Amino acid sequence: MQVILLDKVANLGSLGDQVNVKAGYARNFLVPQGKAVPATKKNIEFFEARRAELEAKLAEVLAAANARAEKIDALETVTIASKAGDEGKLFGSIGTRDIADAVTAAGVEVAKSEVRLPNGVLRTTGEHEVSFQVHSEVFAKVIVNVVAE
């Protein structure tokens, strides 16, 4: 199925690219999320007329994401208290929701879907580096300090 991309999509293309994807991927993911439209003659003409407007909107979203990433980077460290045993092993774990709540409480609004934990959930006390994917191209890092209650 031919679609026109309205946003940058990983491993597929960027704004304005006309790509061929499987019908289910287009119908169930790209079109409902507003990342693509079917490549009909009407849509191609409509897109070409609005191309500059869409590019400006994309640049505005990227600038807002960069501003949020700078705010997150400015936090540097966030402390989370959790129950732990004698050797520093946590009872339970600290996941994306806990980290997102702690950063939001520190003053920067973050969704749990933006938190990236490359080594999985945090299960020990100490300092852990956590990254945030604010936009497909914009990342921020924060040190999460886990202390025992």
Swiss-Prot record:
<keyword id="KW-0007">Acetylation</keyword>
<dbReference type="InterPro" id="IPR020069">
    <property type="entry name" value="Ribosomal_bL9_C"/>
</dbReference>
<dbReference type="GO" id="GO:1990904">
    <property type="term" value="C:ribonucleoprotein complex"/>
</dbReference>
<dbReference type="GO" id="GO:0005840">
    <property type="term" value="C:ribosome"/>
</dbReference>
<comment type="similarity">
    <text>Belongs to the bacterial ribosomal protein bL9 family.</text>
</comment>
<comment type="function">
    <text>Binds to the 23S rRNA.</text>
</comment>
<dbReference type="InterPro" id="IPR036935">
    <property type="entry name" value="Ribosomal_bL9_N_sf"/>
</dbReference>
<dbReference type="GO" id="GO:0019843">
    <property type="term" value="F:rRNA binding"/>
</dbReference>
<dbReference type="InterPro" id="IPR036791">
    <property type="entry name" value="Ribosomal_bL9_C_sf"/>
</dbReference>
<keyword id="KW-0699">rRNA-binding</keyword>
<dbReference type="InterPro" id="IPR009027">
    <property type="entry name" value="Ribosomal_bL9/RNase_H1_N"/>
</dbReference>
<dbReference type="GO" id="GO:0003735">
    <property type="term" value="F:structural constituent of ribosome"/>
</dbReference>
<dbReference type="InterPro" id="IPR020594">
    <property type="entry name" value="Ribosomal_bL9_bac/chp"/>
</dbReference>
<dbReference type="Pfam" id="PF03948">
    <property type="entry name" value="Ribosomal_L9_C"/>
</dbReference>
<keyword id="KW-0694">RNA-binding</keyword>
<keyword id="KW-0687">Ribonucleoprotein</keyword>
<dbReference type="InterPro" id="IPR000244">
    <property type="entry name" value="Ribosomal_bL9"/>
</dbReference>
<protein>
    <recommendedName>
        <fullName>Large ribosomal subunit protein bL9</fullName>
    </recommendedName>
</protein>
<dbReference type="Pfam" id="PF01281">
    <property type="entry name" value="Ribosomal_L9_N"/>
</dbReference>
<dbReference type="GO" id="GO:0006412">
    <property type="term" value="P:translation"/>
</dbReference>
<dbReference type="InterPro" id="IPR020070">
    <property type="entry name" value="Ribosomal_bL9_N"/>
</dbReference>
<keyword id="KW-0689">Ribosomal protein</keyword>
<feature type="modified residue" description="N6-acetyllysine">
    <location>
        <position position="89"/>
    </location>
</feature>
